[in-house]
Amino acid sequence: MTEKKYIVALDQGTTSSRAVVMDHDANIISVSQREFEQIYPKPGWVEHDPMEIWATQSSTLVEVLAKADISSDQIAAIGITNQRETTIVWEKETGKPIYNAIVWQCRRTAEICEHLKRDGLEDYIRSNTGLVIDPYFSGTKVKWILDHVEGSRERARRGELLFGTVDTWLIWKMTQGRVHVTDYTNASRTMLFNIHTLDWDDKMLEVLDIPREMLPEVRRSSEVYGQTNIGGKGGTRIPISGIAGDQQAALFGQLCVKEGMAKNTYGTGCFMLMNTGEKAVKSENGLLTTIACGPTGEVNYALEGAVFMAGASIQWLRDEMKLINDAYDSEYFATKVQNTNGVYVVPAFTGLGAPYWDPYARGAIFGLTRGVNANHIIRATLESIAYQTRDVLEAMQADSGIRLHALRVDGGAVANNFLMQFQSDILGTRVERPEVREVTALGAAYLAGLAVGFWQNLDELQEKAVIEREFRPGIETTERNYRYAGWKKAVKRAMAWEEHDE
């Protein structure tokens, strides 16, 4: 009898590294997770230690195999999904990072972004990279590192330094420096990549003064990139055969591979993606045009709206405000009151993402009266996640001309039934919650498994996409629009807060 085979998905996130083992029926066999330190050197700055990312991720791989009691030669392939945009520059010779990883949430490059806008590059960048000018993306982060680490730009020109997003860093480490690659989805988040020619964009490299020598090779999201024996007893070589940025992996894991299908992931931030097939739709409404995975991991396009603060705003209630002891408590307290008593929380702690793109917005609570208590504020914070999702969906429908019939959801916060019901109420659309919650890992596993023939095609995977619960709108249109108008008013007042503070 042949040994049973499995796929391992490595899910390197913003706050933790995880490893997930799946069998052929897409059942989760075991999960291992390790958190790592968030570094905040200055207000609005966010960093990670790349060596800690590697240490936590590699140890979860060893751990998850031990937990599942399977040997490395039972692993058919490894797929990688990762926090996107986070930027690492390291020495080719030693593998030592020259600076901490600059995280996607970090706003330190706002000034560089202002220069790009003043130089009239907005339309060029939107047309060619699909992105807006914002500190969120990797390009300005790489420039910042090269500007601030002495001699680094010259070293990069000499081929001594390498740049990578987290996927690239992990594969480089897993292959002992033999493989320096990324995939189309991650490359499309750098602001350095032309999403039409599918190559690094010479003009952007010139504008940001980033040497081409340091960039990884860009490949499909589903193919064999190299082999690793990390965690392997006796040096079994396991193919690494799937890479996708976390949101594109979730889109694929939800099997949103046809034009017009959309999903929203509720994690640290909120990310809604709608597959637009082989057509790159240029957004007129503050969304991003990004690369997604087609049915066999080939290039498709998607519209994306990124909301920076979703689960992070619940953590704020817990860690800074001390209003709850556990994120799961938020649902209980939110349902202790009938409504928010007129309160709106705008969680613009690091500015606002889509469709506003205002790095100078700041968090605010509006509508406070004497009768407002902690439960109202907890409820309003949860509701802010759903309102921000509606902001994005409105923009998406305007750009694509496609009316969404159902939204597939995933991520930690979807366990919150209050939030999911309110989401359906405020959108006026069905919300579908899948049985398998680990859709990001699932997407990475699918991409890796398809590349090595573990699964033959997507038809084989369709029956595994079971919807566990469907939420339907329970409020009238007038009420929905009235509440949403209040939210829009609150957002308007939170915008451009920081820039007047000379």
Curated annotation (Swiss-Prot):
<keyword id="KW-0418">Kinase</keyword>
<dbReference type="InterPro" id="IPR000577">
    <property type="entry name" value="Carb_kinase_FGGY"/>
</dbReference>
<comment type="similarity">
    <text>Belongs to the FGGY kinase family.</text>
</comment>
<dbReference type="GO" id="GO:0004370">
    <property type="term" value="F:glycerol kinase activity"/>
</dbReference>
<feature type="binding site">
    <location>
        <position position="14"/>
    </location>
    <ligand>
        <name>ATP</name>
    </ligand>
</feature>
<dbReference type="InterPro" id="IPR018483">
    <property type="entry name" value="Carb_kinase_FGGY_CS"/>
</dbReference>
<feature type="binding site">
    <location>
        <position position="14"/>
    </location>
    <ligand>
        <name>sn-glycerol 3-phosphate</name>
    </ligand>
</feature>
<feature type="binding site">
    <location>
        <position position="15"/>
    </location>
    <ligand>
        <name>ATP</name>
    </ligand>
</feature>
<comment type="subunit">
    <text>Homotetramer and homodimer (in equilibrium). Heterodimer with EIIA-Glc (crr). Binds 1 zinc ion per glycerol kinase EIIA-Glc dimer. The zinc ion is important for dimerization.</text>
</comment>
<feature type="binding site">
    <location>
        <position position="268"/>
    </location>
    <ligand>
        <name>ATP</name>
    </ligand>
</feature>
<feature type="binding site">
    <location>
        <position position="235"/>
    </location>
    <ligand>
        <name>beta-D-fructose 1,6-bisphosphate</name>
    </ligand>
</feature>
<dbReference type="InterPro" id="IPR018484">
    <property type="entry name" value="FGGY_N"/>
</dbReference>
<feature type="binding site">
    <location>
        <position position="315"/>
    </location>
    <ligand>
        <name>ATP</name>
    </ligand>
</feature>
<keyword id="KW-0319">Glycerol metabolism</keyword>
<feature type="binding site">
    <location>
        <position position="85"/>
    </location>
    <ligand>
        <name>sn-glycerol 3-phosphate</name>
    </ligand>
</feature>
<dbReference type="GO" id="GO:0006071">
    <property type="term" value="P:glycerol metabolic process"/>
</dbReference>
<comment type="function">
    <text>Key enzyme in the regulation of glycerol uptake and metabolism. Catalyzes the phosphorylation of glycerol to yield sn-glycerol 3-phosphate. It also catalyzes the phosphorylation of dihydroxyacetone, L-glyceraldehyde and D-glyceraldehyde. It uses only ATP.</text>
</comment>
<keyword id="KW-0479">Metal-binding</keyword>
<dbReference type="GO" id="GO:0006974">
    <property type="term" value="P:DNA damage response"/>
</dbReference>
<dbReference type="Pfam" id="PF00370">
    <property type="entry name" value="FGGY_N"/>
</dbReference>
<dbReference type="InterPro" id="IPR005999">
    <property type="entry name" value="Glycerol_kin"/>
</dbReference>
<feature type="binding site">
    <location>
        <position position="416"/>
    </location>
    <ligand>
        <name>ADP</name>
    </ligand>
</feature>
<dbReference type="GO" id="GO:0005829">
    <property type="term" value="C:cytosol"/>
</dbReference>
<feature type="binding site">
    <location>
        <position position="412"/>
    </location>
    <ligand>
        <name>ATP</name>
    </ligand>
</feature>
<feature type="binding site">
    <location>
        <position position="311"/>
    </location>
    <ligand>
        <name>ATP</name>
    </ligand>
</feature>
<feature type="binding site">
    <location>
        <position position="84"/>
    </location>
    <ligand>
        <name>sn-glycerol 3-phosphate</name>
    </ligand>
</feature>
<comment type="pathway">
    <text>Polyol metabolism; glycerol degradation via glycerol kinase pathway; sn-glycerol 3-phosphate from glycerol: step 1/1.</text>
</comment>
<keyword id="KW-0547">Nucleotide-binding</keyword>
<feature type="binding site">
    <location>
        <position position="246"/>
    </location>
    <ligand>
        <name>sn-glycerol 3-phosphate</name>
    </ligand>
</feature>
<dbReference type="Pfam" id="PF02782">
    <property type="entry name" value="FGGY_C"/>
</dbReference>
<feature type="binding site">
    <location>
        <position position="237"/>
    </location>
    <ligand>
        <name>beta-D-fructose 1,6-bisphosphate</name>
    </ligand>
</feature>
<feature type="binding site">
    <location>
        <position position="268"/>
    </location>
    <ligand>
        <name>ADP</name>
    </ligand>
</feature>
<dbReference type="GO" id="GO:0005524">
    <property type="term" value="F:ATP binding"/>
</dbReference>
<dbReference type="GO" id="GO:0042802">
    <property type="term" value="F:identical protein binding"/>
</dbReference>
<dbReference type="GO" id="GO:0046872">
    <property type="term" value="F:metal ion binding"/>
</dbReference>
<feature type="binding site">
    <location>
        <position position="479"/>
    </location>
    <ligand>
        <name>Zn(2+)</name>
    </ligand>
</feature>
<feature type="binding site">
    <location>
        <position position="246"/>
    </location>
    <ligand>
        <name>glycerol</name>
    </ligand>
</feature>
<feature type="binding site">
    <location>
        <position position="412"/>
    </location>
    <ligand>
        <name>ADP</name>
    </ligand>
</feature>
<feature type="binding site">
    <location>
        <position position="136"/>
    </location>
    <ligand>
        <name>glycerol</name>
    </ligand>
</feature>
<feature type="binding site">
    <location>
        <position position="311"/>
    </location>
    <ligand>
        <name>ADP</name>
    </ligand>
</feature>
<dbReference type="InterPro" id="IPR043129">
    <property type="entry name" value="ATPase_NBD"/>
</dbReference>
<feature type="binding site">
    <location>
        <position position="16"/>
    </location>
    <ligand>
        <name>ATP</name>
    </ligand>
</feature>
